From Swiss-Prot:
Record keywords: Membrane, Photosynthesis, Photosystem II, Reaction center, Thylakoid, Transmembrane, Transmembrane helix
Topological type in the membrane: Single-pass membrane protein
Cystine crosslinks: none
The protein, known as: Photosystem II reaction center protein K
Transmembrane segments: 26-46
Native species: Prochlorococcus marinus (strain NATL1A)
Signal peptide: none
Lineage of source species: Bacteria, Bacillati, Cyanobacteriota, Cyanophyceae, Synechococcales
PANTHER family: PHOTOSYSTEM II REACTION CENTER PROTEIN K, PTHR35325
A GO BP annotation: photosynthesis
Function of the protein: One of the components of the core complex of photosystem II (PSII). PSII is a light-driven water:plastoquinone oxidoreductase that uses light energy to abstract electrons from H(2)O, generating O(2) and a proton gradient subsequently used for ATP formation. It consists of a core antenna complex that captures photons, and an electron transfer chain that converts photonic excitation into a charge separation.
Location(s) in or outside the cell: Cellular thylakoid membrane
A cellular-component GO term for this protein: plasma membrane-derived thylakoid membrane
Subunit structure of this chain's protein: PSII is composed of 1 copy each of membrane proteins PsbA, PsbB, PsbC, PsbD, PsbE, PsbF, PsbH, PsbI, PsbJ, PsbK, PsbL, PsbM, PsbT, PsbX, PsbY, Psb30/Ycf12, peripheral proteins PsbO, CyanoQ (PsbQ), PsbU, PsbV and a large number of cofactors. It forms dimeric complexes.
InterPro entries: PSII_PsbK, PSII_PsbK_sf
Amino acid sequence: MALINFDLLAELPVAYQAFAPTVDVLPLIPLFFFLLVFVWQAAVGFR
């Protein structure tokens, strides 16, 4: 039975550590699109 060390998966490799702040923000991008739908509909009057 193979045991997976999830701490290893949760950490970026050393070569990508510079991108850590960007990776932290990436999951929020779909939420911005979701909110943009409501802003757009409010702008056009919820047609």
